[in-house]
Amino acid sequence: MKVLIACEESQEVCKAFRLFGHEAYSCDVQEPSGGHPEWHILGDAVPALRGGQIVTMDDKGHYIDAWDLLIAHPPCTYLSNAGARHLWKGHQLQEDRVMKGILGRDLFMRFWWADIPRICVENPVPSKVLCLPEYTQIIQPYQFEIGRAHV
């Protein structure tokens, strides 16, 4: 499969898919800490969603007809229900925080609506204020962890 892992600086998910033979690429606005710049698209993930010609950090071009799977980890600071309590300070709405939440929601929705057959958008329980779609499942790490495996 051709796999795009958006908002992934660590490359842990990318390396796991590569280990099983998939053509996986991480994409983030930060340089990767995972040691594989040849698998990393540095920059905004939104243009990469379309596929086509992508360039990895080793300056090599790769042509992706279409992605088979998108796994996205958009920043959750302004999207999660836990952060909603910071929208008001005293009795004053924190407009900058609201705007950051709206921008975060827009990024989330670009992933959610991407023209890719299999999509996973990982995020905590969303804030109701931002009208994000209802989550389809809740997975806690302890439900699947049988010891930590690092790839």
Indicate residue ranges for each PLM-predicted region.
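Conserved active-site and SAM-binding loop architecture
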Residues: 1-148
